[in-house]
Every structure is written in C-alpha cells, then in structure tokens.
C-alpha cells in the first residue's frame, strides 16, 4: 500500500499498539486501562487448559517449522527461544518437537491433582498424550502441502507506522512462508480451539489481525529480497481429544459415539474388540474388526476438517486500507483515553452483557464504580495481579 492510500485525516499523539490492544479498547476503554495503563492481569492459575494447551502446541509447531526451514536453507531469521506457558519451560530455538513433547510430561507431573482434573475435564486426555497425538496427526494431515512450502520465518516480530498518523502497529506472525507452486509469500496464523466450527472465507477475510500482519511484514520481505505477502493462511487445530468408539452387544459401532478420528479408531480396534452377541448362550459373540466403510468415512475431507482445517485468503489492499483506517481511529480513541485516565483515574466504560459478562476485570470494575477510582483496591482480592516491572504501559 502506498502512503497516498493510507489514512491521513487524523494526527494522533504517538501510539504504539498491537492488535490485541486495539481490540480490547474497542470492547471497553476501562478494561484497556486496567491492562495497558495499570498493568493488571488475571492471577496466574494452573487451571487454564484451553490457553495453555494452545501454547504447548504452538511451541511444538514452531520447532517443527523452524527445523524444516533450516533443513531446506530457506529460513531467513533464527528464533532465539520458544516459549510455552507462563509457568512452563522456555526452550532454545533449536529445540526439537520431540523434546517439547517430552518436557510436557514433566510439566504435567508438576501440576496439582485439582489442576490435572480440570485439564482432563476440558481436554479429554493428559497433556502429553494429547500433544503427541495432535502433533503426529497435524504433520500427517499436511505432509503433502508442506512439501510445497518454503519456511521463511517463524514467530516473526514486525513493526510498521501507518503513514501520516503517528500510529505504529506491531505484532508477531506465527509463520511466513513462500508457496512454491503459486510463487507468492503467505502469512499464516495458527489457532487452536476446543472444536472447529464452520468458518467461511469471508469470515477470514474480515479478520483484520492477519491482514494487518501481511501489511506489517511487507518491509521485512523487501529486506529478504522477497515480494510482499499476497495471501494469508489460517491453520486451525482442534484441541479437545477424540472420544473412544463404543460397540453394541450385536457387534456394531454405537451411534452414540461418533466424535473420534481415524487414528483413534484404528488404535482402538487394532487387536479386535470382543462383543458378547445378542443370544444368551453366547453363540452370537465375536470380535469386531476395522471396517473399510468406517475407515473411508473417517478419512473423508468432511470428517478430517473437524480436526484440522486450512484456508488461503488473498490480501486485499482495499481491505487492508479499511483495517488501517479503523486501527488509526481506535488509536485516536486510545490517546483520548490516556488523557481522561490521567485526569480522572478512570476511562469510559462500555456497559453491556457482551462486554462485561466474561471480562477478567469485572469485579474490580464494579467495586470502583461504587467506591470511586481513588480508593485502595488490592488486585489479589479480585483475582488479578500486576504484570512484571518491565511493563511499558503500551
């Protein structure tokens, strides 16, 4: 995008913002103040499996892609370290996926019994078992596509100013790669979630995060003598473990359990599954073996997409322009929030169930609305903590 295509109407007090900062301010300026001015966070907990499993898988995935880039000589930037969770280990950038999966066992063993139960309730399997399973399945699912991809960078930091605004955006891209067949550079975002819902190409085109990342990485690509990113890719992975198949007395697969993948099915019936039959004398008993029809069903794109899904979406300069204008406008609002917070000790609040129901700062916010912003409020009494001292206030 050329400077003449960028928003220039507003000159904003210099702001340096991430996508997360912008979206939180859009949700509620007061919540933004708690996080980015006061430096508050939710108190650390051993029981955040949805977030922490995603961090562990991202770490194994990053190690895998870095190794591919090194082996093929396409990697432009080395990653110094790979992080897992707040309470988990940090690895050197040269770590292997196998080492990360092995370390997850030590992490799992250190969790308290209550925390492990919470993990099992949500994930369906112990962390090490699920991580090993999903990583193996992910590699197998995308092995053919991976041959067509030249890994350029992993967890790549970018920073770029929106011309004429005083706003600098920055962030980290999960992966930058070159599609060898299409001859284009692609920015990829990896997301883990409990289950994979239906996501359309339009939904992903309107996801400003990765579209902005493609724009932000254009100068880096130029330094690497590569063209600007032409597309963004989404790599979606289901976190929750597959169920174990069940069999009826008659030796048929139970219709009550269908939420399993091919690997789980084949492992389950590898040695045969005995069934007692419907006759009292046991004459109808037998052993269930893998069915070709079930294997074909589980290998079908429709079923596989319930566990792993990828989409490629073109970068639109007009869409990027719209997102940049929106980002600049939000940063203008952020500048005003800083002034109001400095003068009054609080920011505007977006009241409403959607904004407040699941807000991590809701209890503190309610207390300050009653007692005023100038009182003494210990964060730990509201399930919060201060971030580390290096917090920049941005």
Positions of the model-derived regions?
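A non-catalytic, helix-rich entry segment at domain boundaries
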Residues: 59-155, 161
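Short acidic, Pro/Gly- and aromatic-enriched capping/linker segments at domain boundaries
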Residues: 8-22
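Cysteine-cluster motifs in flexible loop/terminal segments that predominantly coordinate metals
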Residues: 6, 27-32, 263, 269-296, ...
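Short amphipathic alpha-helical segments and their helix-coil junctions
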Residues: 11, 30-43, 187, 193-197, ...
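Nuclease catalytic cores
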Residues: 21-69, 128, 155-156, 353-363
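Surface-exposed helix-capping loop/turn segments at secondary-structure junctions
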Residues: 67-76, 145, 220-227, 335-351
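Short loop/turn segments at secondary-structure transitions that flank enzyme active sites
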Residues: 31, 40, 63, 67, ...
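Mg2+/Mn2+-dependent nuclease catalytic core
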Residues: 149-329
């Amino acid at each position: 995008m050329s400077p003449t295509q960028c928003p220039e109407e507003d000159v904003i007090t210099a702001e340096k913002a991430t996508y997360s900062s912008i979206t939180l301010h859009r949700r509620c300026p007061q919540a933004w103040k708690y996080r980015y001015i006061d430096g508050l966070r939710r108190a650390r907990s051993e029981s955040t499996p949805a977030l922490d499993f995603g961090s562990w898988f991202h770490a194994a995935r990053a190690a895998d892609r870095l190794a591919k880039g090194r082996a093929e000589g396409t990697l432009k930037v080395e990653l110094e370290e790979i992080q897992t969770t707040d309470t988990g280990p940090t690895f050197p950038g040269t770590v292997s996926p196998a080492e990360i999966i092995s370390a997850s066992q030590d992490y799992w063993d250190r969790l308290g019994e209550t925390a492990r139960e919470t993990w099992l309730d949500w994930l369906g399997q112990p962390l090490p078992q699920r991580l090993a399973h999903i990583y193996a399945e992910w590699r197998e699912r995308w092995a053919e596509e991976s041959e067509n991809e030249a890994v350029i960078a992993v967890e790549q930091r970018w920073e770029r100013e929106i011309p004429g605004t005083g706003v600098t955006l920055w962030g980290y891209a999960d992966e930058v790669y070159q599609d060898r067949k299409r001859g284009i550079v692609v920015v990829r975002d990896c997301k883990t979630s409990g289950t994979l819902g239906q996501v359309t190409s339009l939904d992903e085109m309107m996801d400003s995060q990765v579209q902005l990342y493609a724009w932000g990485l254009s100068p880096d690509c130029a330094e690497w003598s590569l063209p600007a990113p032409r597309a963004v890719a989404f790599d979606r992975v289901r976190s929750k473990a597959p169920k174990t198949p069940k069999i009826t007395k008659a030796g048929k697969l139970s219709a009550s359990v269908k939420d399993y993948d091919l690997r789980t099915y084949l492992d389950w019936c590898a040695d045969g599954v005995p069934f007692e039959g419907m006759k009292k004398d046991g004459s109808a008993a037998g052993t269930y073996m893998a069915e070709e029809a079930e294997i074909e069903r589980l290998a079908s794109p429709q079923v596989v997409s319930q566990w792993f899904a990828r989409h490629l979406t073109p970068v639109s300069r007009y869409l990027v322009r719209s997102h940049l204008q929106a980002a600049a406008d939000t940063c203008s609002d952020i500048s005003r929030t800083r002034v109001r917070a400095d003068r009054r000790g609080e920011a505007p609040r977006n009241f409403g169930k959607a904004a407040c129901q699941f807000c991590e700062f809701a209890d503190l916010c309610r207390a300050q609305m009653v007692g005023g912003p100038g009182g003494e409020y210990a964060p730990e009494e509201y399930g919060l903590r201060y971030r580390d001292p290096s917090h920049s206030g941005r």
